[in-house]
């Protein structure tokens, strides 16, 4: 998992509440267990028309937001069924941070495990970030995880809270496997000791 320390980029404003995981990544894309290639399925029912052509009205199809790294979204983002493919799709598209007032619990947890930072802010702060995001490619936003702040294009800042352990994992690029490998020396020592003291086992 790539480390997350600071992120600077264009933020796409998605002013829709209750975006569920089926909208983020529809069920037909869940057949794979690969984490790559899912970006094409991100919001596919909104990004594409029935004939397969792009919907020019959807935010991520607009020229200013095609390379967005941050998503500013309406309340209760990521609600609905459990599917780890949702953060995989966001990440594969290039989005590493989602900002909203609230998230579906399972989606929220899955984001941290896959290198995507979900940030909760107040409605007032979200409205300000929507305004910043609507300025497009001329107004980048910076996420500073170390300082736990969002810096807008005009220098204004929004502070956010994050669990210290999750912050540690993101800043050091540690997923579940990485966390286990951090304890490799202790695990090896335990196993060597067990072989000596419990040779019969």
UniProtKB/Swiss-Prot annotation:
Protein name: 3-isopropylmalate dehydratase small subunit
Catalytic activity: (2R,3S)-3-isopropylmalate = (2S)-2-isopropylmalate
Record's keyword annotation contains Lyase: yes
Subunit structure: Heterodimer of LeuC and LeuD.
Gene Ontology molecular function: 3-isopropylmalate dehydratase activity
Annotated EC: 4.2.1.33
Gene3D superfamilies from the UniProt entry: Aconitase, domain 4
Transmembrane annotation, as ranges: none
Example GO biological process: L-leucine biosynthetic process
SUPFAM superfamilies: LeuD/IlvD-like
Function text: Catalyzes the isomerization between 2-isopropylmalate and 3-isopropylmalate, via the formation of 2-isopropylmaleate.
Family statement drawn from the similarity comment of this UniProt entry: Belongs to the LeuD family. LeuD type 1 subfamily.
Biological pathway: Amino-acid biosynthesis; L-leucine biosynthesis; L-leucine from 3-methyl-2-oxobutanoate: step 2/4
Domain of life: Bacteria
NCBIfam families per record: leuD (TIGR00171), PRK01641.1 (NF002458)
Pfam families cross-referenced by the UniProt entry: Aconitase_C
Record-level GO cellular component terms: 3-isopropylmalate dehydratase complex
Enzyme class, UniProt record, top EC level: lyase
Keyword terms of this UniProt record: Amino-acid biosynthesis, Branched-chain amino acid biosynthesis, Leucine biosynthesis, Lyase
């Amino acid at each position: 998992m790539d480390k997350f320390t600071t992120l600077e980029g264009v933020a796409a404003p998605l002013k829709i509440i209750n975006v569920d995981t089926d909208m983020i990544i529809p069920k037909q894309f869940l057949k794979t267990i690969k984490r790559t290639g899912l970006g094409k399925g991100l919001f596919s029912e909104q990004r594409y028309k029935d004939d397969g052509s792009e919907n020019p009205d959807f935010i991520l199809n607009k020229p200013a937001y095609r390379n967005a790294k941050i998503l500013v979204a309406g309340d209760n983002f990521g609600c609905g069924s459990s599917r780890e493919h949702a953060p995989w799709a966001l990440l594969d598209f290039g989005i590493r941070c989602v900002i909203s007032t609230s998230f579906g619990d399972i989606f929220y947890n899955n984001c941290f495990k896959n290198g995507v930072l979900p940030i909760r802010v107040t409605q007032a702060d979200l409205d300000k970030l929507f305004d910043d995001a609507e300025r497009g490619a001329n107004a980048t936003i910076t996420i500073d995880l170390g300082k736990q702040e969002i810096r807008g294009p005009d220098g204004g800042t929004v502070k956010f809270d994050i669990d210290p352990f999750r912050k540690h994992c993101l800043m050091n690029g540690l997923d579940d496997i990485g966390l286990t490998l951090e304890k490799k020396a202790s695990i090896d020592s335990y196993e060597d000791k067990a072989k000596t003291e419990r040779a019969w086992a």
